[in-house]
Amino acid sequence: MSGRGKGGKVKGKAKSRSNRAGLQFPVGRIHRLLRKGNYAERVGAGAPVYLAAVMEYLAAEVLELAGNAARDNKKTRIIPRHLQLAIRNDEELNKLLSGVTIAQGGVLPNIQAVLLPKKTEKKA
Protein backbone atom coordinates (compact mmCIF):
# COMPACT_ATOMS: atom_id res chain seq x y z
CA MET A 1 0.00 0.00 0.00
CA SER A 2 2.76 2.42 -0.74
CA GLY A 3 1.81 5.71 -2.32
CA ARG A 4 -1.84 4.83 -2.63
CA GLY A 5 -3.36 7.34 -0.25
CA LYS A 6 -6.41 6.62 1.87
CA GLY A 7 -8.58 5.08 -0.79
CA GLY A 8 -10.82 6.71 -3.34
CA LYS A 9 -13.56 8.93 -1.94
CA VAL A 10 -16.84 8.58 -3.74
CA LYS A 11 -18.10 12.05 -4.59
CA GLY A 12 -21.81 12.54 -4.09
CA LYS A 13 -24.14 14.69 -6.12
CA ALA A 14 -22.72 18.16 -6.88
CA LYS A 15 -23.98 20.82 -4.48
CA SER A 16 -24.22 24.40 -5.71
CA ARG A 17 -22.79 27.22 -3.65
CA SER A 18 -26.30 28.62 -3.31
CA ASN A 19 -27.40 25.32 -1.75
CA ARG A 20 -24.43 25.28 0.61
CA ALA A 21 -25.25 28.81 1.75
CA GLY A 22 -28.99 28.07 1.95
CA LEU A 23 -29.86 30.78 -0.57
CA GLN A 24 -32.19 31.05 -3.55
CA PHE A 25 -30.14 33.69 -5.38
CA PRO A 26 -27.38 32.29 -7.65
CA VAL A 27 -23.99 32.62 -5.95
CA GLY A 28 -22.08 31.33 -9.00
CA ARG A 29 -23.71 33.81 -11.36
CA ILE A 30 -23.07 36.71 -8.98
CA HIS A 31 -19.42 35.63 -8.69
CA ARG A 32 -19.11 35.57 -12.48
CA LEU A 33 -20.69 39.02 -12.79
CA LEU A 34 -18.37 40.43 -10.11
CA ARG A 35 -15.34 39.10 -11.99
CA LYS A 36 -16.56 40.30 -15.40
CA GLY A 37 -17.66 43.72 -14.13
CA ASN A 38 -14.12 44.98 -13.41
CA TYR A 39 -15.04 45.99 -9.86
CA ALA A 40 -11.74 44.63 -8.57
CA GLU A 41 -8.80 42.63 -9.84
CA ARG A 42 -9.70 39.68 -7.64
CA VAL A 43 -12.93 38.54 -5.98
CA GLY A 44 -12.88 36.56 -2.72
CA ALA A 45 -14.90 33.38 -2.26
CA GLY A 46 -17.14 34.89 0.41
CA ALA A 47 -18.02 38.09 -1.43
CA PRO A 48 -20.60 36.64 -3.85
CA VAL A 49 -22.22 34.63 -1.04
CA TYR A 50 -22.60 37.74 1.11
CA LEU A 51 -23.89 39.82 -1.81
CA ALA A 52 -26.39 37.10 -2.78
CA ALA A 53 -27.64 36.94 0.82
CA VAL A 54 -28.09 40.73 1.01
CA MET A 55 -29.89 40.85 -2.34
CA GLU A 56 -32.16 37.96 -1.35
CA TYR A 57 -33.02 39.62 1.96
CA LEU A 58 -33.88 42.95 0.28
CA ALA A 59 -36.01 41.21 -2.36
CA ALA A 60 -37.87 39.25 0.32
CA GLU A 61 -38.45 42.40 2.37
CA VAL A 62 -39.85 44.37 -0.60
CA LEU A 63 -42.02 41.44 -1.74
CA GLU A 64 -43.39 40.94 1.78
CA LEU A 65 -44.44 44.59 2.05
CA ALA A 66 -45.77 44.67 -1.53
CA GLY A 67 -47.79 41.52 -0.86
CA ASN A 68 -49.31 43.18 2.20
CA ALA A 69 -50.16 46.25 0.09
CA ALA A 70 -51.79 44.02 -2.54
CA ARG A 71 -53.81 42.21 0.14
CA ASP A 72 -54.93 45.55 1.61
CA ASN A 73 -56.27 46.46 -1.85
CA LYS A 74 -57.99 43.04 -2.13
CA LYS A 75 -55.76 41.95 -5.02
CA THR A 76 -53.92 38.65 -5.51
CA ARG A 77 -51.29 39.97 -7.92
CA ILE A 78 -48.54 42.45 -7.07
CA ILE A 79 -48.44 45.39 -9.49
CA PRO A 80 -45.99 48.34 -9.62
CA ARG A 81 -48.43 50.43 -7.57
CA HIS A 82 -48.13 47.95 -4.69
CA LEU A 83 -44.33 48.10 -4.90
CA GLN A 84 -44.46 51.90 -4.80
CA LEU A 85 -46.78 51.95 -1.78
CA ALA A 86 -44.66 49.36 0.03
CA ILE A 87 -41.35 51.15 -0.54
CA ARG A 88 -42.55 54.71 0.11
CA ASN A 89 -44.40 53.78 3.32
CA ASP A 90 -41.31 52.07 4.78
CA GLU A 91 -38.84 54.61 6.16
CA GLU A 92 -35.63 52.63 5.56
CA LEU A 93 -36.56 51.31 2.10
CA ASN A 94 -37.68 54.80 1.09
CA LYS A 95 -34.30 56.20 2.12
CA LEU A 96 -32.45 53.41 0.27
CA LEU A 97 -34.52 53.80 -2.91
CA SER A 98 -35.09 57.56 -2.73
CA GLY A 99 -33.57 58.15 -6.17
CA VAL A 100 -35.54 55.36 -7.85
CA THR A 101 -38.58 55.99 -10.03
CA ILE A 102 -41.01 53.08 -10.32
CA ALA A 103 -42.84 53.08 -13.65
CA GLN A 104 -46.64 52.98 -13.25
CA GLY A 105 -46.16 53.40 -9.50
CA GLY A 106 -48.22 56.54 -8.99
CA VAL A 107 -47.82 58.77 -5.93
CA LEU A 108 -48.59 58.39 -2.25
CA PRO A 109 -51.96 59.74 -1.19
CA ASN A 110 -51.27 62.88 0.84
CA ILE A 111 -53.56 65.78 1.77
CA GLN A 112 -52.07 68.80 3.53
CA ALA A 113 -53.55 69.38 6.99
CA VAL A 114 -54.56 72.98 6.18
CA LEU A 115 -56.75 71.75 3.32
CA LEU A 116 -58.78 69.39 5.49
CA PRO A 117 -62.17 70.65 6.75
CA LYS A 118 -62.04 72.17 10.22
CA LYS A 119 -63.74 70.24 13.00
CA THR A 120 -66.28 72.44 14.79
CA GLU A 121 -67.44 71.66 18.31
CA LYS A 122 -71.21 71.64 18.76
CA LYS A 123 -72.46 73.06 22.05
CA ALA A 124 -75.34 71.13 23.64
Curated annotation (Swiss-Prot):
CDD domains: HFD_H2A. There is a cross-link at residue 119 (Glycyl lysine isopeptide (Lys-Gly) (interchain with G-Cter in ubiquitin)). The modification Phosphoserine is found at residue 2. SUPFAM superfamilies: Histone-fold (SSF47113). It comes from the Eukaryota. GO terms for molecular function: DNA binding; protein heterodimerization activity; structural constituent of chromatin. One of its GO terms (cellular component) is chromosome. It is found in: Nucleus; Chromosome. The modification N-acetylserine is found at residue 2. The modification Phosphothreonine is found at residue 120. This is Histone H2A. The lineage of its organism: Eukaryota, Metazoa, Ecdysozoa, Arthropoda, Hexapoda. The gene is His2A.
